[in-house]
Amino acid sequence: PKGFGYPTQITIMTFSVDKESDLQVLALNAASAALFVSNIDINTSVSAVRAAKIDGELVLNPTLSELNRSTLDLYLSGTKDDLLMIEMRSMGGERVDSSLVLDPLMDPTFSAPIITTHVSNAIGEDELIAIFEKTEQLLFESNAKYEEAFKAFKKETMEIEYKAHLLNEEMVKYVRENHFADIKSAMNQMAKSERSTALRSIRKKIILEQEDWNEAELKDAIENVKKEQVRAQILNERVRADGRALNEIRPISISTNVLPRAHSSCLFTRGQTQALVVLTMGGPKDAQMFENLTDNGTQNENFMVHYNFPGFSVGEASPIMGTKRRELGHGNLAKRALEPIVNLDGQTVRIVSEILESNGSSSMATVCGGYMALRAADIETSDVIAGIAMGMVSEGNKYAILSDIMGLEDHDGDMDFKVTGSKEGITAMQMDIKLGGISLNVLKEALYQAKEGRAHIIDIMVEAEKNIEFNDGVLPSTDFFHIDPSFIGEIIGQAGKTIREIIEKFEVAIDI
């Protein structure tokens, strides 16, 4: 509830696993049920639904084995009235293109070679909206059933004091009437650190004018007027703080293989967001091993995307420590976006994105830079993939959808909707709503505006591809060939002596 400021911990523990149940869906439903029946004043449940597409058919709440055969993984959560969160990815696979037509007079034992092509299985906007409609209905129905089923077990609501955060209306009025133009000018400072400095100067100026005012309360008042100004300008003037139109993309520059000793690299800059994306290739033994509760054994991850967000990228002197939750999430989203378009076939690829400066959409810069790094390493891809972050500002029945949002619009807006894909379809998406819900009509409009933005970015990336110069001196090559099994012992040698000598002498990796 609003004003509930008490530390609350929900603990979800897995005691038994059948290797077919979706733990992510079950965990959210269990957490929601625990909150709903508690003595906290919560009267709405939240649940999750997963959708898969198997052999062209939609399957709701698939088992894990069914999900492994799917070309779509869509995860939605919400209440009985509103959609709150979406995560989606397509899963690449092999498409059978053709096989040799056999002459009836040929040897019947002859086996014709089958020709396949790797495809991303990106899904189009219209098909995705149709799937949303079906899964959303199941989501709404399940929440209504949950609430009805758990109502009898709900504890009596406890009487607690809620912490009201009240603005000083006198300060808000004074700031609005006397310093609105100053705040509007400060919003033109696009970097987060520059905006903060400008707003701090305004605060100090007002304190000199009103010496008896509380500085913390004044800071809240200035923040409130700033948010009003940003949102009103977008809704009423249809112009953003940096002067862009609602669907306008910031200027983009792309440089590839800027690091001469890396296998490949890309410096991707969009506005004041810049990512240095570096790709390293390896063999099968370089894959990362991991285990899941629902797996039967150790798995190998041969495509990795890691995202690092140092403090200096936003002008903060913060210590460089372990990977944070946000960095894990952004890296995972970029991996989901790019993985469907590559068929590594025995190779291992690690992509690392170092954010050098950030003013919003750094995860989408990672996706764009990651694709360019793949091409700069001469790795075949089935599609050109770009990413764009969409936003929204809404007041009553009035709303505006924003393309390529910057940090200010993410902070003061109502939606953070990241969409990645080709010109034809979507490979991954992630949506978080601050409003408490979004209608399918608004979601559809955002998807199509994102498609236009992706097409613009992809055109720039395709042009940049033409200027790629490979780092031939350091770029590894992979050869696959067959040897007579009877010679394997000689190649390995006594206790591995021969194969080690070959590896050291020729600086190669050998996997038999």
Residue spans for each PLM region:
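Glycine-rich, flexible beta-strand/loop modules in the N-terminal catalytic cores of phosphate-handling
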Residues: 1-8, 14-16, 20-21, 80, ...
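Secondary-structure transition/capping motifs at alpha-helix termini
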Residues: 2-4, 37-43, 284-286, 298, ...
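Flexible, glycine/charged-enriched surface loops at secondary-structure junctions
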Residues: 2-8, 43-45, 142-160, 193-194, ...
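Mobile "lid/hinge" segments at catalytic clefts and subdomain interfaces of large enzymes
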Residues: 41-187, 374-468
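Polar interaction faces of repeat-based domains
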Residues: 505-512
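Structured alpha-helical segments in the cores of large, soluble enzyme domains
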Residues: 1-3, 72-77, 301-307, 330-344, ...
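Extended amphipathic alpha-helical scaffolds
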Residues: 45, 154-298, 476-490, 498
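Conserved phosphate/anionic-ligand binding catalytic regions in large, soluble enzymes, centered on
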Residues: 21-39, 256-279, 359-379, 489-499
